[in-house]
Design a protein with these regions (language model features):
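A structural signal for short loop-to-beta-strand junctions that line the ligand-binding cleft
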Residues: 3-13, 137-145
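Short, solvent-exposed amphipathic alpha-helical segments in soluble enzyme
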Residues: 56-58, 104-105, 170-174
Length: 187
């Protein structure tokens, strides 16, 4: 059950891509190449951790085969740049600032999810959808990357009044184009 106690879903916002990032100078080219490597699966109890764990499991990569660490995006990016970790997962809208900044420090490669794993993921939950990160989204990324996407959802506390929630959604949707432009996200 994905429901969060004390909150309710207000609106679907945009699709977040599960981005799997490695250094371009590494020998990691597929998910299977993560075996024996240290991988940031996102902050503890985050959506990124959930997605990363599911992807690795369905690829046959358990915690016995991959050293999984919980790091927030900034820490993971710093450790990938310095070579302290081998890969990071980041579930966010494409053109993610932390990945763009990391690409200025070192050359990167994004990993695609293979068809077999992708089919398993899509069969696992209706929240996942196939997502293509277009070529040239990030510096040095010269080909499309196949991954999964999940819808970002705006949650509101059950304590918020109906009027406040209505005003929030009215403001959000009346400025949806501005939001999409300002954040480089697909609306």
């Amino acid at each position: 059950d994905n429901r969060q106690q004390g909150y309710r879903a207000i609106a679907g916002l945009y699709t977040e891509a599960c981005q799997i990032v490695v250094r371009a100078d590494s020998d990691i080219r597929t998910l299977n190449d993560l075996q024996g490597k240290t991988v940031s699966i996102g902050a503890s109890e985050s959506g990124t951790e959930q997605n990363a764990t599911e992807i690795l499991k369905l690829s046959g990569l358990t915690s016995k085969l991959v050293h999984m660490v919980n790091l927030d995006y900034a820490d993971a990016a710093g450790k990938l740049a310095s070579g302290e970790i081998d890969a990071l997962f980041c579930t966010a809208g494409i053109r993610t600032a932390v990945i763009e900044e990391l690409a200025k420090e070192c050359d990167l490669r994004l990993l695609s999810i293979d068809d077999t794993c992708l089919e398993k993921l899509l069969a696992t939950t209706k929240e996942y959808r196939k997502y293509i990160i277009p070529a040239n989204t990030y510096s040095g990324q010269n080909k499309d990357v196949t991954t999964i996407g999940v819808k970002a959802v705006l949650l509101a506390s059950d304590d918020l009044s109906k009027e406040t929630v209505e005003k929030l959604t009215e403001t959000l949707f009346s400025h949806a184009q501005d939001l999409a432009y300002a954040t480089s996200l697909d609306a």
